[in-house]
């Protein structure tokens, strides 16, 4: 091994130690935030989306997926500090994204189909994950479920290996700057979902229901 290569590796090792120290400091601060929130919502998908969008924009020389992957794990670990008892009902086609998004910190319930996901939520699961392609079924379900809301679409950037997934929770997503509104209605051929740019306040009208206002998806790698 040349002296130059040895020096470079030593520098990388030092950087790794510094990164780890910063991660530990971040976790301490996350615990302080939890104490200051005094019982507020543990999971804030809007806040996460805005943080990731800011970080991706501040590092245009890095792949967006790299930034999102790193902070996804940090944010999930921080959420688990406040509440590690969340239960996630996961459609079988969303299992890969569930593992990526929640990192194994929470209990997951594998579900074969939409009906199984609905039952798991009826039985008390906190969050449900449905893959893209289930929009009609999701719209029909949430039209009659005032207590459930779409709170996110994940991953927040395009991925060649992970299919996009809808996330459903029991509280509306926290507001962010860049948003889109999801409206469910009965169409000519059955339930359908409309995605509207921005925030639509108030009732959708015509038997429709706003089933979620979520962060707009950001940059694609």
Language-model features, listed with the residues they occupy:
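Domain-level signature for soluble enzymes in the chorismate/prephenate branch of the shikimate pathway
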Residues: 1-221
């Amino acid at each position: 091994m040349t002296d130059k290569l040895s020096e470079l590796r030593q520098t990388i090792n030092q950087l790794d130690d510094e990164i780890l120290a910063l991660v530990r400091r971040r976790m301490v601060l996350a615990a302080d935030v939890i104490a200051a929130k005094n019982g507020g919502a543990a999971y804030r998908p809007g806040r996460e989306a805005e943080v990731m969008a800011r970080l991706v924009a501040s590092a245009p020389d890095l792949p967006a997926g790299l930034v999102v992957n790193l902070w996804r794990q940090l944010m999930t670990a921080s959420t688990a500090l406040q509440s590690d008892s969340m239960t996630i009902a996961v459609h079988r086609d969303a299992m890969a994204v569930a593992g990526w998004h929640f990192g194994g910190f929470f209990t997951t319930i594998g579900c074969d189909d939409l009906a199984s996901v609905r039952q798991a939520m009826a039985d008390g699961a906190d969050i449900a994950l449905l893959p893209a392609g289930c929009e009609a079924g999701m719209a029909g379900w949430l039209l009659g479920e005032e207590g459930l809301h779409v709170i996110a679409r994940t991953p927040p950037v395009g991925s060649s290996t992970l299919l996009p997934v809808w996330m459903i929770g029991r509280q509306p997503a926290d507001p962010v700057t860049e948003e889109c509104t999801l409206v469910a209605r009965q169409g000519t051929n059955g339930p359908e979902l409309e995605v509207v740019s921005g925030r639509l306040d108030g009732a959708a009208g015509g038997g429709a229901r706003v089933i979620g206002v979520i962060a707009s998806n950001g940059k694609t790698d």
